[in-house]
């Protein structure tokens, strides 16, 4: 399983590919919607790409609980 640092780096790459945001902007405390301006459609693409990259399943009902980058890192690490 990937370390939390590896998960964060992987998520930053995925967010960069989807939104064009610099990977340095994707920090654990950042909110996907408020800080990174990621809409629901982009978020679903990010989730699908994260599932593929990390070999996990993130149920649709869990996606709404992934408010911050850290929430996503913690979920993936614990999956």
Swiss-Prot record:
Q: Which UniProt keywords apply?
A: Cytoplasm, Fatty acid biosynthesis, Fatty acid metabolism, Lipid biosynthesis, Lipid metabolism, Phosphopantetheine, Phosphoprotein
**Domain of life from the UniProt record:** Bacteria
List O-(pantetheine 4'-phosphoryl)serine occurrences by residue.
Answer: 40
What are the Carrier domain coordinates in residue numbering? 2-79
A cellular component annotation (GO) from this entry:
membrane
A GO term (biological process) for this protein?
lipid A biosynthetic process
Q: Which GO terms describe its molecular function?
A: acyl binding; acyl carrier activity
Q: In which pathway does it act?
A: Lipid metabolism; fatty acid biosynthesis
Subcellular location as annotated: Cytoplasm
Processing and modification events after translation: 4'-phosphopantetheine is transferred from CoA to a specific serine of apo-ACP by AcpS. This modification is essential for activity because fatty acids are bound in thioester linkage to the sulfhydryl of the prosthetic group.
Q: Which family does it belong to?
A: Belongs to the acyl carrier protein (ACP) family.
- Primary role: Carrier of the growing fatty acid chain in fatty acid biosynthesis.
Q: What is this protein called?
A: Acyl carrier protein
Q: What is the lineage of its organism?
A: Bacteria, Pseudomonadati, Myxococcota, Myxococcia, Myxococcales
Gene encoding it? acpP
């Amino acid at each position: 399983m990937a370390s939390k640092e590896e998960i964060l780096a992987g998520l930053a790459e995925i967010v960069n590919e989807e939104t064009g945001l610099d990977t340095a902007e994707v920090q654990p405390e950042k909110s996907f919607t408020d800080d990174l301006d990621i809409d629901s459609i982009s978020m679903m693409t990010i989730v699908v790409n994260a599932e593929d990259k990390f070999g996990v399943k993130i149920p649709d009902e869990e996606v709404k609980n992934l408010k911050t980058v850290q929430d996503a890192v913690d979920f993936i690490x614990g999956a």
